[in-house]
């Protein structure tokens, strides 16, 4: 910490601006990191930010994403990064080094140990991109105990109350994001002209130095930021990565040094700065629970230890706006009247159907199907899409983005956008596009305002579609609403999705009471992100006599890694802005998942499900691909109802439970979607499974490939 303070003190005495440089550890090769660190210093870097790679960054542009991916392929993890700092120190690195990254790898390593080991390795502090304020206080105290700095981030959208709080926890400098969007820079784009005003606003609350990041790529841009009153200028790694790419074999350190000299002006005559932003006498604050009140949520943000907002600073204001709009809406009878007025469009209430043949097959409890598959667009997803569209209109958004896996949420979102005349962009993993090609056509058939963008990063599935949608939202906050499809993501998304899906459970309770005069004994739903399941479960949580059963995708079996059984096999962590159960490796990197059903192929789960699991209120079990196919076949052939592959997981487990119960009991299974979308996929898969399932469909009916 003291080394960082000393840099800014020396620069102030020289009437100069500190040069802060960023590079991703392990890029382009593991062995390049130490020479690159030394080259940054030789090129004039006063402080170095060393990026800890993460598999699923949500605020980084394509260049840094690529650097993260390459670094992870080079087996870079937290201990490796610390080893590189040690080696660089031994070879003469004296510049302060800040470790910059996302919280989950540190959480997996162990927060206390991560801080202690960083200090011993020679690091000087941390910049955590997605650490919430309530946790930042404790984290900062731990850092200070090891003489490490915690550097908070402030964005152009940060409110004055939040600036006041963040300024109170800054001990060496504040990292100021000068423009909204993902990381990246361009020599041809001007730095935010409002920068002097932004810096002046922050200085009302602090005397610590301000280092400005985003958009700096050239010496002229560096000088502009310095003249605006910045105490430090951050040259983000995208430009340094491009310099590395331009280098030939063995030339990386020299190219990096040359670029840094060009930007920093090292070796050139000293330059007199233009008068900067006016200095004010800041109010002095001590970080505590009282100062954190400026960043409190107006709706409950956590379910036990799960939930929260683990997001970049640039998203915080948009989430607060959304939270306030949702609270206002759900307290407004006119809003719910408008929602209910659309039930004739979405085909609510959905039927509660007694599956007599399935019940007879099981020989136990009555099996009831909640027919969400009969909704407009073919699944429960329309409930949430309609509710969020009305919210988006309420806050004046004109552009809608969404992620989709099986395509059901994509179709529902594109459909309601067509109805309300809004622009619509759907992100879909390239693998899911392959599995659900007809869904893509159906979305784009809805009109010129709707289109699908295939995502080719990572595993090319739902997880990666969420990443891209998040990045889009960060960049286009003023016009865009991110219509999240499942009960995932940062607060308030899990609450919003639940509030628009809980109609499922409310209807089940009323409908079964009408025909049976009682509550169900068991309710069953499939669980990926968990929207249909939380919608089914929520109204029954206080009813302790009702057993809640969520069915996860067991894939090829949970004894290996090809599954999506997050609650059964995962550990608590942070993914896509929320603390919940996730599937991760020992280093805190998100692992690739597998399910025969695209909609369940996700390595996280809604935080309310995580709480229901840990509290023991709900049980979560797994169903393999094979058993899901058996459930698909069973319902299709016994009832003439073709279920979605996602719902087939719940069908299999529901029948299994029904067999164990007496005939006077009632089990309700949420049939979350219809299987029209999966018929082509089943026809392609069936030859592989035919003998194992003893399911032989005429070869003339199966298209040859």
UniProtKB/Swiss-Prot annotation:
<dbReference type="InterPro" id="IPR002028">
    <property type="entry name" value="Trp_synthase_suA"/>
</dbReference>
<dbReference type="Pfam" id="PF00290">
    <property type="entry name" value="Trp_syntA"/>
</dbReference>
<dbReference type="InterPro" id="IPR013785">
    <property type="entry name" value="Aldolase_TIM"/>
</dbReference>
<feature type="modified residue" description="N6-(pyridoxal phosphate)lysine">
    <location>
        <position position="381"/>
    </location>
</feature>
<dbReference type="InterPro" id="IPR023026">
    <property type="entry name" value="Trp_synth_beta/beta-like"/>
</dbReference>
<keyword id="KW-0663">Pyridoxal phosphate</keyword>
<comment type="pathway">
    <text>Amino-acid biosynthesis; L-tryptophan biosynthesis; L-tryptophan from chorismate: step 5/5.</text>
</comment>
<dbReference type="InterPro" id="IPR036052">
    <property type="entry name" value="TrpB-like_PALP_sf"/>
</dbReference>
<dbReference type="InterPro" id="IPR006654">
    <property type="entry name" value="Trp_synth_beta"/>
</dbReference>
<keyword id="KW-0822">Tryptophan biosynthesis</keyword>
<keyword id="KW-0057">Aromatic amino acid biosynthesis</keyword>
<comment type="similarity">
    <text>In the C-terminal section; belongs to the TrpB family.</text>
</comment>
<keyword id="KW-0028">Amino-acid biosynthesis</keyword>
<keyword id="KW-0456">Lyase</keyword>
<feature type="region of interest" description="Disordered">
    <location>
        <begin position="266"/>
        <end position="287"/>
    </location>
</feature>
<feature type="region of interest" description="Tryptophan synthase alpha chain">
    <location>
        <begin position="1"/>
        <end position="293"/>
    </location>
</feature>
<dbReference type="InterPro" id="IPR006653">
    <property type="entry name" value="Trp_synth_b_CS"/>
</dbReference>
<comment type="similarity">
    <text>In the N-terminal section; belongs to the TrpA family.</text>
</comment>
<dbReference type="InterPro" id="IPR018204">
    <property type="entry name" value="Trp_synthase_alpha_AS"/>
</dbReference>
<feature type="active site" description="Proton acceptor">
    <location>
        <position position="60"/>
    </location>
</feature>
<feature type="active site" description="Proton acceptor">
    <location>
        <position position="49"/>
    </location>
</feature>
<dbReference type="Pfam" id="PF00291">
    <property type="entry name" value="PALP"/>
</dbReference>
<dbReference type="GO" id="GO:0004834">
    <property type="term" value="F:tryptophan synthase activity"/>
</dbReference>
<protein>
    <recommendedName>
        <fullName>Tryptophan synthase</fullName>
        <ecNumber>4.2.1.20</ecNumber>
    </recommendedName>
</protein>
<dbReference type="InterPro" id="IPR011060">
    <property type="entry name" value="RibuloseP-bd_barrel"/>
</dbReference>
<dbReference type="InterPro" id="IPR001926">
    <property type="entry name" value="TrpB-like_PALP"/>
</dbReference>
<dbReference type="GO" id="GO:0005737">
    <property type="term" value="C:cytoplasm"/>
</dbReference>
<feature type="region of interest" description="Tryptophan synthase beta chain">
    <location>
        <begin position="294"/>
        <end position="705"/>
    </location>
</feature>
